């Protein structure tokens, strides 16, 4: 199990986030550290509330050793794979909760970038979209402004062929091979934008690597919280 706090100044590298994971499994510190580092990449380092990385943050994992089994000292131990899956599940759940609790958040946004040449490119695109003020305000206003998503993809600095670009909001395909889908129904997409959970899928179509980022919208409440705040 674990606990985490943080709602503002969050784009961990690992930022203003405190997270503590506890397990009764008797696992050596070296293995715990490696498992934590491996799973942070796609959990806490895949979230962004406001794109700002704080001067401090921490995710720690502790073993109480209370479980009655022989100590795990090797990655080849058959118990490690099951523990690895469970650890990622806990970390991802906590990371998503930090985003959902973000300052002024009204929507939870999942941005999945698929079929890139490499994971670095996929991550750049995902965070370029996740951190775009124009994208985030459009989402807050429940506006299916896919043009802003295209803009954010373009400014990511990744070489790509826009003639192969595909963009979906939820199950609705908006852009197909670089052009608006001839069957696109804006009213249907506008209705989808009223949901509290929004999925944006971006298919780059020039490779096989992917990255998923999690973020929130940028609301008037967020601005009020941060303009009224005094240090």
What residue ranges belong to the model's regions?
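A structural signal for small-residue-enriched, beta-sheet-centric alpha/beta enzyme cores
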Residues: 1-231
């Amino acid at each position: 199990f674990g606990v985490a706090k943080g709602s503002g100044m969050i784009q961990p590298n690992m930022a203003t986030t405190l997270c503590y994971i506890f397990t009764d499994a008797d696992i050596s510190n070296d293995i715990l550290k490696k498992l934590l580092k491996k799973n942070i990449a796609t959990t806490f380092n895949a979230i962004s509330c406001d794109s700002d990385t704080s001067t401090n943050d921490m995710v720690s994992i502790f073993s109480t050793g209370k479980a009655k089994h022989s100590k795990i000292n090797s990655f080849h131990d058959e118990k490690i794979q099951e523990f690895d899956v469970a650890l990622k599940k806990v970390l991802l759940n906590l990371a998503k909760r930090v985003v959902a609790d973000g300052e002024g958040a009204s929507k939870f946004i999942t941005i999945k970038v698929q079929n890139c040449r490499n994971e670095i490119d996929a991550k750049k695109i995902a965070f370029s979209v996740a951190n775009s003020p124009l994208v985030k305000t459009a989402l807050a206003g429940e506006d299916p402004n896919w043009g802003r998503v295209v803009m954010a993809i373009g400014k990511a600095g990744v070489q790509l062929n826009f003639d192969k670009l595909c963009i979906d909001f939820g199950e609705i395909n908006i852009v197909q091979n670089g052009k608006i889908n001839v069957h696109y129904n804006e009213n249907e997409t506008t209705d989808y934008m009223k949901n509290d959970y929004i999925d944006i899928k971006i298919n780059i179509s020039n490779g096989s690597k992917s990255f998923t980022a999690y973020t929130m919208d940028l609301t008037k409440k967020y601005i009020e919280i941060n303009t009224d705040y005094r240090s």
